[in-house]
Amino acid sequence: LFLKLMDEASEIQAHAGGTIMLPEHLLWKHFQGMGGQAILAYLKDVVWPEMGKKYGDIFGKEFLIESPEILADIVGQLSALNLTSADTDIKGDAFEYFLKNAYQGVSIKDLGEYFTPRNVVRTMVSMVDPKFGEKIYDPFCGTGGFLIESFRYLKLRTKTTDDTDRILRKETIYGSEITSNARIAKMNMILFGDGHANLYRHDSFAHPQTGKFDIIITNPPYSQKTRYGNLYPVPSTSGDAVAMIHCFDALNEGGRACILMKEDFLTEGGDVGAVREYMFKNAKNFSVVSLPRKMFEPYTPTKTSILYFEKKGGRNS
């Protein structure tokens, strides 16, 4: 899917007189007419290693498809399609289908963080209303849904020049993900126009980002534990508490956040309550949008809300 979309994007750029995204010998049309065994050998021995050099860890070290017949069938069916003209949701559906099948050994509850409903994603992006030149950060980016939508939101509202294109691609989108889905997030960003340069695979809790971003938009994991809470203004071992303080701390003064949270955050005591009190002292313009309980089923029955706020200048302990 990635190679087919890259090929279509390169063809569009070539017709527009631009530079194609891939060398000629890596384009889809170069191998689509080969037999199954020849396609398998070419992708494994030529395309995969070169794409690995170009895009780093987006491509795994091993080419995992072993059946020439299955590969030839995939190539044949994709060759008949024009994916670029399809609604972007169709591309997202394809990646979600892949993830759900690739993670058959993982409980459906554990997959919930990756499949935030798109209407929720779009609502949250419109709430923060990104502006050109702002830095947008998702510290728990999963497969990149919030970052993709933010990137698309800006692209539609920004006049394209070499400078604006460079800033959007390299100085706007930031994210991290602890699982191997960081690779999928990077791939997703490239397919939707780039912005993958500042996506990292690491534990966000271990990497505070104090005052660096204009916008935080995220769906953090729920009910986790962390040993990195002592790195933050309100120390805790509760992942729920540290996720919120990580997001708050990463905002610059005047920055705004939109976070999909467990509704319990509004009433819990203990460490979560301490973080909530700290945020109420140091932020303003709070808004809460309560979501239906079944919004995330079948992944999780957890009742959730969208929390919006803006960070004040200075800090009150």
Describe the predicted segments one by one.
Residues 1-128, 132, 198-204, 290-294, ...:
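Non-catalytic, mostly N-terminal accessory regions of nucleic-acid modification and defense proteins
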Residues 110-218, 223-230, 237, 241-242, ...:
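Conserved S-adenosyl-L-methionine
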Residues 243-251:
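Structured alpha-helical segments in the cores of large, soluble enzyme domains
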Residues 251-257:
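Short glycine-dipeptide loop
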Residues 261-264, 293:
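Short strand-turn motif at the edge of the Rossmann-like AdoMet-binding core
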Residues 264-269, 297-298:
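Acceptor-substrate binding/catalytic loop of class I
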Residues 280-293:
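Conserved short secondary-structure elements within globular domains
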Residues 297-317:
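Flexible, glycine-/basic-rich loop-and-beta segments that form/coincide
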